[in-house]
Amino acid sequence: MFFGDTLDIIFLSFVAVGTFIALINVFLSIRKPRVFGSHGRRTKRWLRISAILFFIYMAISLSSTVLSNMIWGDGSYRDPANELQVLGTTIGSLSFSAIVHAQLKLTFDLYDKDTSDNRNKSFGLFMSPQILNLIYFVVTHIRLYAENLPSRGFQTVSNVSSITFMLVPFFIWVASVISLVFTLIYAARTQVPVPRGAFGCLLASSILSVIRHTWLAILNILYFVASRTNGRLYLVFPDYFSNISIVITVWFAALCVLLLIVGSSKGLRGREPWRDEYSYGPAVSGYPPLEPAPIHMTSYGRAY
């Protein structure tokens, strides 16, 4: 049986709304992939990945929220709600990195900067927090299930879990800031024509992402500092704080994915390599049409 006051019900409703938006994002990214055109295949792939991962994260968060308010939860660290929270935190960090990675991919595709060097940079920004994320998942489950650890070993595992839990959002915040910087630099310096709607959606998604990850990074640092003071420092937030936090952490992320999908449909559609039936030579993207073929030549370059 579920119990809770009005604020708990509002919190659960906010999580449910975020889950619904995440489901819409999955539908839009999978149901009609042709709306993006054939350009930017990596962007479309990462949009689908980020949308699916974020929906899984929201489904786990919704289940964990309901489960933590069930009467039969024993409140111990190993109860089902806490196990779901650890899994949700891990998948959530993976989905947030994927969203930032999709932002970078869309930026590179819109401004024709999808070079090998940029791909390596974006992949490095994606993998750096995920290495820490994997460490967090492993050591937290060691703490969760290894009951026979000596006290010193248990303390070491707890410290590693706390440190990685703090560092993962910080690394993702760094990646989100770099993504925003790339967007602003390419928009100011390149001459590639980009539809205003696509640039506006990309910029809005990047700004929301920076705000969201700044919020999370600050909160995690505060929690880490409080946990290191041996109880001398307590963080006391108003009752409605969790509802504000869920809007920033969940709704902003869902809107980021939705804005990226809309921006991709506006910016990537119609950017396929140009080819005309009266032209010959390779198809070229971003350049004027080739001269018409001579009248004695067919469109395949063969004489009559």
What residue spans do the PLM features occupy?
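Membrane-proximal first intracellular loop
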Residues: M1-D117, T190-A198, L235-Y240
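Extracellular loop 3-seventh transmembrane helix
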Residues: D5-T19, Y77-F96, Q155-S176, R196-E277
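Residue-level signal for alpha-helical transmembrane segments in multi-pass membrane proteins
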Residues: I21-L28, S64-L67, A102, Y136-V139, ...
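Cytosolic juxtamembrane helix at the C-terminal end of the final transmembrane segment
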Residues: I30-P33, Q103-D117, Y145-P150, V181-V194, ...
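Helix-to-loop junction signature of class
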Residues: Y57-G75, I135-S151, S209-N230
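The cytoplasmic-loop to transmembrane-helix boundary for the fourth helix
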Residues: D109-T140
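Extended, charged alpha-helical interaction scaffolds
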Residues: I131-R189
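Intrinsically disordered, low-complexity terminal tails of fungal membrane proteins
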Residues: V262-Y304
